[in-house]
């Protein structure tokens, strides 16, 4: 049963209402103008860190293979565009904003104080790039009847349905498009979101948003050290090497031999899961049991019975699971068989801490994000293996969705989604 049906979500009427509101907002907006200023952006990082930047143009979007930055935000939107031409206007506008924000520059001045400011001002007079990446993905719903794109939908893209341990909230699921915004500092991420919303009042409406972070040592290592999640375990140890281009072609990127629509080449399937942790319950669980559930030493990250984090577990010599339990997380997620090689994926998860639930429990957990060339062979296959794992007692997926990360922008004459919309 599809998620929207269970929760009675009426998407078309909601979009019409939001589009009317967006049109009113657009009437009060003003064109962008750039002015030269030398004021520095605030922040605790050194100027060198603030000036770090990722290339915007290329075969693939940044933010997928990019070493994880410290701060992250996931924002899903409903698209309010009325037709395909309107959708093209949206994608061109997003491309322009991403290009400016990720490369940095002087904040625009507002020549007429009776009009709204052209920039939020939260970064000061100069918008430093701050290692910002903004990755645009499209959801299953963008390929409905509105824009005539159904024949071009990626073959494995689908609506997220419930797994046995899920407790999905309709307000935290799906979206026509998804932005993954990452940077060295949270204020840069927030500034980027506000800039994008300001420029698209008649084209986008926020559906849901979650902000995340990774442990400081991992962010400063630029991908060399594994983040630690809020259960206290290293998260992403078994990730494939993102610096290995040949391996990434096999694991992450859609290629010409997959019988996918031609426009998808260079893109990637993205699975997003908002996973709530029962941290109070976990913190009262004995260390030995925690390690048995994960199959790893909590301090070193090494597979049980081994010494180092990146040691490869030897399941063949432990067929009964006496060292690493048969239902441990690492053993189910990656059994290390010839068959499981096809289900590799690149994880890019972040922790979140939101406040307190209605029941008085800490609301914190994991923003799970992974990329793969085939959603069914990747995330869906792995998640089916994990159904019933011992860790389920401590975690509860509450939202997310499946998306397709668009191929990159070739140059200044190109725009995100151009190959899709020109078909």
Swiss-Prot record:
Alphabetical list of Pfam families matching this protein: Dyp_perox_C, Dyp_perox_N
EC number: 4.98.1.1, 1.11.1.-
Binding site for heme b: 236-238, 329, 334-336, 347
Keyword Transmembrane helix: no
Gene Ontology, cellular component aspect: cytosol; periplasmic space
Keyword Transcription: no
Cofactor note: Binds 1 heme b (iron(II)-protoporphyrin IX) group non-covalently per subunit.
Induction context: Expressed in response to iron deprivation at pH 7.
Catalysed reactions listed for this entry: heme b + 2 H(+) = protoporphyrin IX + Fe(2+)
Necessary cofactors: heme b
Disulfide bonds: none
Any GO BP annotation: iron import into cell
PTM characteristics: Predicted to be exported by the Tat system. The position of the signal peptide cleavage has not been experimentally proven.
Signal peptide: 1-35
GO MF annotation: an example: peroxidase activity
Keywords, in A-Z order: Heme, Iron, Lyase, Metal-binding, Oxidoreductase, Periplasm, Peroxidase, Signal
Protein localization: Periplasm
Assembly and interaction partners: Homodimer. Part of a ferrous iron transporter composed of EfeU, EfeO and EfeB.
Similarity comment: Belongs to the DyP-type peroxidase family. EfeB subfamily.
Function according to Swiss-Prot or TrEMBL: Involved in the recovery of exogenous heme iron. Extracts iron from heme while preserving the protoporphyrin ring intact.
PANTHER family tied to this protein: DEFERROCHELATASE, DEFERROCHELATASE/PEROXIDASE
Official protein name in the record: Deferrochelatase
Organism: Escherichia coli O6:H1 (strain CFT073 / ATCC 700928 / UPEC)
């Amino acid at each position: 049963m599809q998620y929207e049906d269970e929760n009675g979500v009426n998407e078309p009427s909601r979009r019409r209402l939001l589009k009317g509101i967006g049109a009113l907002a657009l009437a009060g907006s003003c064109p962008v103008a750039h002015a030269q200023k030398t004021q520095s952006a605030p922040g605790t990082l050194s100027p060198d860190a603030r000036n770090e930047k990722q290339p915007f143009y290329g075969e693939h979007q940044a933010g997928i293979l990019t070493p994880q930055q410290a701060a992250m935000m996931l924002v899903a939107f409903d698209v309010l565009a009325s037709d395909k031409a309107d959708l093209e206007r949206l994608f061109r506008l997003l491309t322009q904003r991403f290009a400016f924000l990720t490369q940095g520059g002087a904040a625009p001045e507002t020549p007429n104080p009776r009009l709204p400011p052209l920039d939020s001002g939260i970064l000061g007079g100069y918008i430093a790039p701050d290692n910002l990446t903004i990755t645009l993905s499209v959801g299953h719903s963008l390929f409905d009847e509105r824009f005539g794109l159904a024949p071009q939908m990626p073959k494995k893209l689908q609506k997220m349905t419930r797994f046995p341990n899920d407790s999905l909230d309709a307000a935290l699921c799906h979206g026509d498009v998804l932005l993954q915004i990452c940077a060295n500092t949270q204020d840069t991420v927030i500034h980027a979101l506000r800039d994008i919303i300001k420029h698209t009042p008649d084209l986008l409406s926020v559906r849901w948003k979650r902000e995340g972070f990774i442990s400081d040592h991992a962010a400063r290592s630029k991908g060399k050290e594994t983040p630690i999640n809020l259960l206290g375990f290293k998260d992403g140890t078994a990730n494939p090497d993102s610096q290995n281009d040949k391996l990434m072609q096999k694991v992450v990127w859609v290629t010409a031999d997959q019988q996918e629509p031609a426009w998808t080449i260079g893109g990637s399937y993205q699975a997003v899961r908002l996973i709530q942790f029962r941290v109070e319950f976990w913190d009262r669980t004995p260390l030995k049991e925690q390690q048995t559930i994960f199959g790893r030493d909590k301090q070193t990250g090494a597979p049980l019975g081994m010494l180092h984090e990146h040691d490869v577990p030897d399941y063949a010599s432990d067929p009964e699971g006496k060292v690493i339990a048969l239902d441990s997380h690492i053993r189910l997620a990656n059994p290390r068989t010839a068959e499981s090689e096809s289900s590799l994926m690149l994880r890019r998860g972040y922790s979140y801490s939101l406040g307190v639930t209605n029941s008085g429990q800490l609301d914190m957990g994991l923003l799970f994000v992974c990329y793969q060339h085939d959603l069914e062979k990747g995330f869906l296959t792995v998640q089916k293996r994990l159904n019933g794992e011992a860790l389920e007692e401590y975690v509860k997926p509450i939202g997310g969705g499946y998306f397709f990360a668009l191929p990159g922008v070739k140059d200044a004459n190109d725009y995100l989604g151009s190959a899709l919309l020109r078909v």
